[in-house]
Design a protein with these regions (language model features):
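Conserved phosphotransfer microenvironments
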Residues: 13, 35, 48-70, 78-84
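Acidic, metal-coordinating helix/loop segments flanking the phosphotransfer/catalytic sites
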Residues: 31-49
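Acidic phosphotransfer microenvironment of two-component signaling modules
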Residues: 10, 33-37, 101
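The C-terminal output helix
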Residues: 108-116
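C-terminal output helix
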Residues: 98-109
Length: 116
C-alpha cells in the first residue's frame, strides 16, 4: 500500500508515518510538508490514501484527488485523523480516529516502553 502524508506540521507527519508503518508493515509512505511537491510526487504513482492537513492543504487535496481518484482521503485535524468510512471498513486496523495519544501509545508499545 502507498500512502501520502501532507502537512506543514513535521512532527505530526513523522508521528503518523511511523504509526502507519507499525500498523501496516511494508507500506510505502511519502511525507511532504509542501503540498505542491506532493502533487508532483504523485503525478505518476498509484496511491491508496492521502493523509492531508485540511487547514493548510485544502487546494492541494483537491488536486491530489483529481490525479488519484481511487485514493482515499483522510484529513488530519487537531483531534487526530478523520478516516472515510470505506477506508476504515476495509482496513480494520485503522478503524478508529488516530489521536496523538493513541499514536504515542502505539509507538511506546513498538519501542517496548508500554509500561512506562
Amino acid at each position: 500500500m502507498t500512502f501520502v502524508t501532507v502537512s506543514d506540521n513535521r512532527e505530526q507527519l513523522a508521528l503518523l508515518s511511523r504509526l502507519l508503518i507499525t500498523l501496516i508493515p511494508g507500506c510505502t509512505i511519502h511525507q511532504n510538508s509542501n503540498p505542491m511537491r506532493a502533487i508532483r510526487c504523485l503525478s505518476h504513482q498509484k496511491v491508496d490514501a492521502v493523509f492531508a492537513d485540511a487547514d493548510t492543504c485544502a487546494n492541494a487535496v483537491e488536486v491530489l484527488h483529481k490525479q488519484n481518484t481511487q485514493a482515499q482521503l483522510c484529513f488530519l485535524c487537531r483531534q487526530g485523523v478523520v478516516l472515510p468510512k470505506e477506508f476504515a471498513c476495509s482496513h480494520s486496523v485503522l478503524s478508529y480516529p488516530i489521536t496523538e495519544q493513541k499514536m504515542r501509545t502505539a509507538l511506546r508499545r513498538e519501542n517496548g516502553l508500554d509500561g512506562v
